[in-house]
Amino acid sequence: MHCAENCIFCKIIAGDIPSAKVYEDEHVLAFLDISQVTKGHTLVIPKTHIENVYEFTDELAKQYFHAVPKIARAIRDEFEPIGLNTLNNNGEKAGQSVFHYHMHIIPRYGKGDGFGAVWKTHADDYKPEDLQNISSSIAKRLASS
């Protein structure tokens, strides 16, 4: 397991900073966000220090994403939210403030629960052939990796 010296999440993994632990295995740690957006708002982190989604190895992704649905189901079953958001930000411009990959699991309880994710769509800006060109360029990149 690789950790970064000044990373707050690595310090939580090491036990240097306390947390309200929800789940732990050899590769993953989940704990309550200290700034609860809603009751049960949980952060899920890999124990290996990676900054963003681009740094996942196939093996680490398998281990990490094996745990996420289990944690989400436990939150659902315990608190019976009407829905659930999973969210992560990659890069400062995308809103990432802690540069250790993490996913927020945010239970939703209805209007006024404190969470709002709003974005503007641009469906009118893209013709069907534009979408085909974009999808083709991504598919080619995937095929070459």
Curated annotation (Swiss-Prot):
Pfam families according to UniProt: HIT
Molecular functions per Gene Ontology: catalytic activity
Domain called HIT: residue spans: 8-116
A biological-process GO annotation: nucleotide metabolic process
Residues passing through the membrane, by range: none
Motif residue range(s): Histidine triad motif: 100-104
Protein name as catalogued: Protein hit
